[in-house]
Amino acid sequence: MPKMKSHRGASKRFKRTASGKLKRGRAYTSHLFGNKSTKAKRKLRKASMVSSGDFKRIRHMIAK
């Protein structure tokens, strides 16, 4: 049986932390910043963790 391939799009978007969690970037960061407050834009710079409901599915997508 051939090796499973990782999902290349998911591999570029998610990174595993040292504790095993998955880190992701935030949405709403590409354009339309004039409508957003400075506080909102600052919060969007921070990375976030993948929710527990999505963790298992994404983990299988990026498994190597």
From Swiss-Prot:
rRNA-binding found in the keyword field: no
Signal sequence interval, chain numbering: none
Disulfide links within the chain: none
MF annotations from Gene Ontology: structural constituent of ribosome
Chain spans, region Disordered: 1-28, 33-52
Keywords: Ribonucleoprotein, Ribosomal protein
Gene3D superfamilies in the cross-refs: 4.10.410.60
InterPro entries: Ribosomal_bL35, Ribosomal_bL35-like, Ribosomal_bL35_CS, Ribosomal_bL35_sf
Basic residues bias locations: 1-26
This protein's name: Large ribosomal subunit protein bL35
Pfam families linked: Ribosomal_L35p (PF01632)
